[in-house]
Amino acid sequence: MLLSPDDAALFYRAWSALLTWVNDRRSIAPRFARPTPEHPLDPSLANKIKDVVWAEDALREEFLAEGSADLGPEERDLVASWTHRVSGNFVILKHLQKHSVFLKEDAYGVLGIYTPLEMMFPSVPVFVEAVLIPFRDVIITDGLLRSPGIHLTFGGGARRMLNAQYSAARAASQMRTTLPWRADATTARPSHQPKPTRRSSRRQPR
């Protein structure tokens, strides 16, 4: 399951503006024009910048105060909501019709942005390093998922344990398919719902 094309474009406008501004502010790499879906950043550079972005919440706050004048209110709300992100190592357990299941301490239902997650990670379960962020009433990633440098396999016992965690979350209605959306909210209500659609495109926004 994916964001709609319009919602994917909204995310990309906000994300690329933030990456560009942080790079200019911190001189991580020589300055570059703001990326577009047609002319994305090289993934290795995007990952370097994103690590700085997520390490310092103050940078996002400065961006909203000083560097986002050309963004609309939806893009600004989106960037502000990223204080509610969930970062770290996850197991992608399975791909369902409506979302992919990410497991950490909790279970999350996550959508792709431009490319279905089942195309990016066809063999599951799999370990990934990811940042989960809210997008109105769904959860997406920042588009830059990293796998371990070594091949890891799951034995029968590990698979049973992961499936038990997922089943327990479902039984207790604790499968998380949303994160707080408004930056000042602890329980968010989306301004309107995105329109998910299934389609194929690039592996990740860059």
Placement of each model-derived feature along the sequence:
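Short, structured beta-strand/loop micro-motifs enriched in basic residues and often containing a Trp
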Residues: 105-114
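Short, charged beta-strand/loop "edge" motif centered at a coil->beta-strand transition
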Residues: 74-80
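Short aromatic-glycine-enriched beta-strand elements
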Residues: 98-102
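Residue-level recognition of conserved beta-strand positions in structured domain cores
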Residues: 104-105, 143
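A structured, charge-rich N-terminal accessory region that forms the first stable segment of a protein
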Residues: 1-73
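Mixed-charge (acidic/basic) macromolecular-recognition segments
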Residues: 128-129, 134-206
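Structural detector for short beta-strands of small beta-barrel domains
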Residues: 80-97
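Short nucleic-acid-contacting surface segments enriched for D/E, G, S/T with interspersed K/R
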Residues: 114-131
